[in-house]
């Protein structure tokens, strides 16, 4: 067990919730917790109670450790932040209205995501963040829809201004799906793609129940499943939600059935998994019925 990892403040024990003493397996399939006996498989002398979190078929695969270990998460970039503030200030209501109409999401949802306008590239601006307001990148969405990032950007999350400190949060792929879920009145955070951002999602939503919203395509679903596995250790609770078969993603679902239907489905998931209602913050709903 020399490769088992000690828990810490950003990766607490999933059994007792404490940040010290407990050990977690390299593939996060089991925990040794000296505090909680209930639910354990057996007692390991001198270490604690063994709790099996999931049965894995990956036991023959050696865990890969890149040289230099796990890379540090990107820090706040004030140079990009200065540019973002300027672009947000330069974005008048007509640009917000135009993008709202293009995406069929509410204007309020775009304001919650701090959308700006970069005149030099004729692009809408979406800040990408970590927790605590750290800006680490900027995504540009030109009039032609071909998205790219400002030079020097790192992949971050699309985080609305009204994200609560706890409660149910819906995590989706991309800025437009994030705006769609906000339009439905849900607390939502967006990843830049389906296969990135796991660590900063876990950092941001450690005290939340998380519903990972998967796209219908195979790549999107696989990325969502990987995030679910990661958040089993790093969040208060996690489950996954898919749009109905005829819709490719959350925004497509909103366009097909309207915000009330999406909200009702989201409420049903939260009630079935955690027995609690979806608590939205500032209502961003409007349009897209």
Which sequence ranges carry the predicted segments?
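TOPRIM metal-binding catalytic domain and adjacent DNA-binding surface shared by DnaG-type primases
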Residues: 1-22, 28, 34, 45-132, ...
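Acidic glycine-/aspartate-rich tracts in secreted/extracellular proteins
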Residues: 37-39
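Phosphate-handling DNA/RNA-contact segment within nucleic-acid enzymes
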Residues: 118-209, 224
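Acidic beta-strand-to-loop metal/phosphate-binding motif
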Residues: 171, 208-219, 242
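Short, acidic/turn-prone active-site loops that include or flank metal/cofactor-
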Residues: 192-197, 215-218, 243-245
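Short, surface-exposed amphipathic charged segments that create phosphate/polyanion-binding patches used
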Residues: 203-208, 249-262
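Short, aromatic/basic amphipathic alpha-helical patches
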Residues: 222-233
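A generic structural motif
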Residues: 237-247
């Amino acid at each position: 067990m020399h490769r088992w990892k000690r828990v810490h403040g950003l990766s607490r024990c999933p059994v007792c919730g404490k940040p010290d003493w407990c050990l977690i397996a390299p593939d996060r399939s089991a925990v040794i917790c000296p505090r909680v006996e209930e639910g354990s498989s057996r007692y390991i002398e001198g270490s604690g109670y063994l709790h099996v979190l999931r049965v894995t078929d990956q036991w023959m695969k050696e865990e890969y450790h890149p040289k230099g270990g796990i890379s540090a998460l990107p820090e706040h970039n004030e140079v990009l932040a200065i540019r973002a503030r300027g672009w947000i200030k330069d974005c008048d209501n007509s640009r917000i209205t135009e993008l709202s109409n293009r995406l069929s999401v509410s204007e309020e949802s775009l304001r919650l995501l701090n959308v700006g306008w970069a005149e030099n590239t004729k692009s809408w601006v979406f800040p990408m963040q970590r927790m605590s307001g750290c800006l680490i990148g900027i995504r540009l969405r030109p009039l032609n829809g071909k998205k790219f990032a400002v030079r020097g950007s790192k992949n971050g999350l699309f985080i609305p201004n009204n994200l609560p400190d706890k409660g149910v949060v819906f995590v989706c792929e991309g800025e437009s799906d994030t705006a769609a879920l906000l339009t439905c009145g849900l607390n939502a955070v967006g990843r830049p793609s389906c296969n990135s951002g796991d660590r900063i999602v876990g950092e941001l939503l450690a005290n939340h129940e998380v519903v990972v919203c998967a796209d219908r395509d195979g790549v999107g679903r696989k990325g969502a499943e990987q995030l679910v596995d990661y958040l089993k250790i790093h969040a208060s609770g996690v489950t996954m939600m898919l749009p109905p078969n005829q819709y490719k993603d959350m925004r497509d679902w909103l366009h097909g059935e309207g915000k009330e239907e999406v909200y009702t489905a989201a409420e049903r998931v939260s009630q079935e998994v955690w027995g609690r209602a979806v608590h939205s913050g500032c209502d961003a709903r409007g349009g897209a019925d």
